[in-house]
Amino acid sequence: MYTSGYANRSSSFPTTTHNAARTATENAAAGLVSEVVYHEDQPMMAQLLLLPLLRQLGQQSRWQLWLTPQQKLSREWVQSSGLPLTKVMQISQLAPRHTLESMIRALRTGNYSVVIGWMTEELTEEEHASLVEAAKVGNAVGFIMRPVRAHALPRRQHSGLKIHSNLYH
Protein backbone atom coordinates (compact mmCIF):
# COMPACT_ATOMS: atom_id res chain seq x y z
CA MET A 1 0.00 0.00 0.00
CA TYR A 2 1.24 3.47 -0.82
CA THR A 3 1.72 5.90 2.01
CA SER A 4 2.78 9.51 1.77
CA GLY A 5 6.06 10.87 3.03
CA TYR A 6 4.12 12.31 5.97
CA ALA A 7 2.96 8.83 7.00
CA ASN A 8 6.50 7.46 6.65
CA ARG A 9 8.14 10.10 8.85
CA SER A 10 9.86 9.18 12.08
CA SER A 11 7.70 9.34 15.13
CA SER A 12 8.11 9.26 18.86
CA PHE A 13 6.08 6.05 19.17
CA PRO A 14 7.90 3.06 20.57
CA THR A 15 9.25 0.65 17.97
CA THR A 16 6.71 -2.02 18.87
CA THR A 17 3.83 0.37 18.24
CA HIS A 18 5.32 1.44 14.90
CA ASN A 19 5.89 -2.20 13.89
CA ALA A 20 2.33 -3.13 14.89
CA ALA A 21 0.92 -0.29 12.80
CA ARG A 22 3.06 -1.28 9.82
CA THR A 23 2.02 -4.92 10.15
CA ALA A 24 -1.64 -3.89 10.29
CA THR A 25 -1.19 -1.88 7.08
CA GLU A 26 0.55 -4.77 5.34
CA ASN A 27 -2.07 -7.26 6.52
CA ALA A 28 -4.90 -5.07 5.22
CA ALA A 29 -3.94 -6.06 1.67
CA ALA A 30 -3.37 -9.73 2.50
CA GLY A 31 -5.72 -11.99 0.64
CA LEU A 32 -6.24 -9.38 -2.07
CA VAL A 33 -6.34 -10.72 -5.61
CA SER A 34 -6.90 -8.14 -8.31
CA GLU A 35 -7.14 -8.46 -12.06
CA VAL A 36 -5.48 -5.75 -14.13
CA VAL A 37 -6.87 -5.66 -17.67
CA TYR A 38 -4.89 -3.54 -20.08
CA HIS A 39 -4.68 -2.21 -23.64
CA GLU A 40 -1.43 -1.70 -25.53
CA ASP A 41 -2.04 2.04 -25.82
CA GLN A 42 -1.93 2.68 -22.04
CA PRO A 43 1.62 1.74 -21.01
CA MET A 44 2.06 4.11 -18.07
CA MET A 45 -1.09 3.23 -16.14
CA ALA A 46 0.30 0.11 -14.48
CA GLN A 47 3.41 1.94 -13.40
CA LEU A 48 1.37 4.78 -11.94
CA LEU A 49 -1.02 2.48 -10.09
CA LEU A 50 0.93 -0.67 -9.22
CA LEU A 51 4.46 0.55 -8.49
CA PRO A 52 3.64 2.36 -5.23
CA LEU A 53 2.03 -0.81 -3.87
CA LEU A 54 4.89 -3.00 -5.12
CA ARG A 55 7.43 -0.66 -3.51
CA GLN A 56 5.56 -0.82 -0.19
CA LEU A 57 5.34 -4.61 -0.35
CA GLY A 58 9.06 -4.64 -1.19
CA GLN A 59 9.76 -3.39 2.33
CA GLN A 60 8.70 -6.77 3.68
CA SER A 61 11.30 -9.49 4.12
CA ARG A 62 9.50 -11.70 1.60
CA TRP A 63 10.02 -12.13 -2.15
CA GLN A 64 8.04 -10.64 -5.02
CA LEU A 65 7.30 -13.29 -7.66
CA TRP A 66 6.70 -12.37 -11.30
CA LEU A 67 5.29 -15.16 -13.48
CA THR A 68 5.88 -13.66 -16.90
CA PRO A 69 4.92 -14.90 -20.37
CA GLN A 70 8.34 -15.78 -21.79
CA GLN A 71 9.89 -12.33 -21.35
CA LYS A 72 12.65 -11.53 -18.95
CA LEU A 73 12.29 -8.54 -16.61
CA SER A 74 14.82 -5.83 -17.26
CA ARG A 75 17.22 -5.48 -14.33
CA GLU A 76 17.56 -1.77 -15.12
CA TRP A 77 13.78 -1.27 -15.01
CA VAL A 78 13.48 -3.07 -11.66
CA GLN A 79 16.20 -0.89 -10.15
CA SER A 80 14.95 2.39 -11.64
CA SER A 81 11.40 1.63 -10.46
CA GLY A 82 12.54 1.46 -6.86
CA LEU A 83 11.74 -2.23 -6.48
CA PRO A 84 14.12 -4.29 -4.35
CA LEU A 85 16.25 -6.15 -6.91
CA THR A 86 17.36 -8.65 -4.27
CA LYS A 87 13.73 -9.59 -3.52
CA VAL A 88 12.36 -9.88 -7.06
CA MET A 89 12.09 -13.41 -8.45
CA GLN A 90 10.94 -14.20 -11.95
CA ILE A 91 9.77 -17.39 -13.58
CA SER A 92 9.06 -17.27 -17.29
CA GLN A 93 6.08 -19.48 -17.95
CA LEU A 94 6.42 -21.43 -21.17
CA ALA A 95 2.82 -22.65 -20.95
CA PRO A 96 0.32 -19.97 -19.84
CA ARG A 97 -2.12 -22.66 -18.68
CA HIS A 98 0.23 -23.37 -15.75
CA THR A 99 0.20 -19.77 -14.51
CA LEU A 100 -2.96 -20.15 -12.40
CA GLU A 101 -1.72 -23.23 -10.56
CA SER A 102 1.72 -21.67 -10.08
CA MET A 103 0.13 -18.53 -8.62
CA ILE A 104 -2.03 -20.56 -6.22
CA ARG A 105 0.96 -22.57 -5.00
CA ALA A 106 3.18 -19.51 -4.61
CA LEU A 107 0.54 -17.44 -2.81
CA ARG A 108 -0.20 -20.29 -0.40
CA THR A 109 3.45 -20.71 0.69
CA GLY A 110 3.71 -17.37 2.47
CA ASN A 111 7.17 -16.86 0.94
CA TYR A 112 5.98 -14.00 -1.28
CA SER A 113 4.47 -10.63 -0.42
CA VAL A 114 3.07 -10.40 -3.95
CA VAL A 115 2.66 -12.78 -6.88
CA ILE A 116 2.06 -11.30 -10.33
CA GLY A 117 0.95 -13.53 -13.19
CA TRP A 118 -0.13 -12.97 -16.77
CA MET A 119 -3.27 -14.73 -18.03
CA THR A 120 -4.78 -14.66 -21.49
CA GLU A 121 -8.34 -15.59 -20.49
CA GLU A 122 -10.80 -14.30 -17.91
CA LEU A 123 -10.87 -16.26 -14.66
CA THR A 124 -13.92 -18.20 -13.56
CA GLU A 125 -15.43 -17.43 -10.16
CA GLU A 126 -14.01 -20.72 -8.88
CA GLU A 127 -10.48 -19.91 -10.10
CA HIS A 128 -10.66 -16.44 -8.54
CA ALA A 129 -11.91 -17.92 -5.24
CA SER A 130 -8.98 -20.38 -5.24
CA LEU A 131 -6.52 -17.51 -5.69
CA VAL A 132 -8.15 -15.46 -2.92
CA GLU A 133 -8.06 -18.40 -0.52
CA ALA A 134 -4.39 -19.05 -1.31
CA ALA A 135 -3.55 -15.35 -0.83
CA LYS A 136 -5.30 -15.36 2.56
CA VAL A 137 -3.45 -18.51 3.67
CA GLY A 138 -0.10 -17.04 2.59
CA ASN A 139 -0.91 -13.51 3.80
CA ALA A 140 -0.06 -12.26 0.30
CA VAL A 141 -1.33 -10.15 -2.60
CA GLY A 142 -1.94 -11.46 -6.12
CA PHE A 143 -2.15 -9.50 -9.36
CA ILE A 144 -3.47 -11.05 -12.54
CA MET A 145 -2.29 -9.13 -15.58
CA ARG A 146 -4.55 -9.76 -18.57
CA PRO A 147 -4.31 -8.19 -22.01
CA VAL A 148 -7.56 -7.40 -23.81
CA ARG A 149 -7.64 -8.23 -27.49
CA ALA A 150 -8.36 -5.13 -29.53
CA HIS A 151 -11.25 -6.82 -31.37
CA ALA A 152 -12.82 -8.40 -28.28
CA LEU A 153 -15.10 -6.39 -26.05
CA PRO A 154 -15.06 -7.23 -22.33
CA ARG A 155 -18.26 -8.56 -20.76
CA ARG A 156 -18.02 -6.05 -17.94
CA GLN A 157 -16.20 -2.78 -17.50
CA HIS A 158 -12.52 -3.18 -16.62
CA SER A 159 -9.73 -0.80 -15.80
CA GLY A 160 -7.12 -0.52 -18.52
CA LEU A 161 -3.62 -1.07 -17.18
CA LYS A 162 -0.43 -2.34 -18.76
CA ILE A 163 3.14 -2.87 -17.72
CA HIS A 164 5.03 -1.40 -20.63
CA SER A 165 7.08 -3.70 -22.83
CA ASN A 166 10.30 -1.77 -22.08
CA LEU A 167 10.29 -3.63 -18.76
CA TYR A 168 11.63 -6.64 -20.61
CA HIS A 169 14.74 -7.14 -22.63
Swiss-Prot record:
SUPFAM superfamilies found in the cross-reference section: P-loop containing nucleoside triphosphate hydrolases
Site (Essential for degradation by Lon protease): 169
Gene3D superfamilies noted in UniProt: P-loop containing nucleotide triphosphate hydrolases
PTM description: Is rapidly cleaved and degraded by the Lon protease once DNA damage is repaired.
Region: Lon protease binding, residue numbers: 162-169
InterPro entries linked: Cell_div_suppressor_SulA, P-loop_NTPase, SulA_CellDiv_inhibitor, SulA_enterobact
Subunit structure comment from the entry: Interacts with FtsZ.
Protein family: Belongs to the SulA family.
Protein name: Cell division inhibitor SulA
Originating organism: Salmonella typhimurium (strain LT2 / SGSC1412 / ATCC 700720)
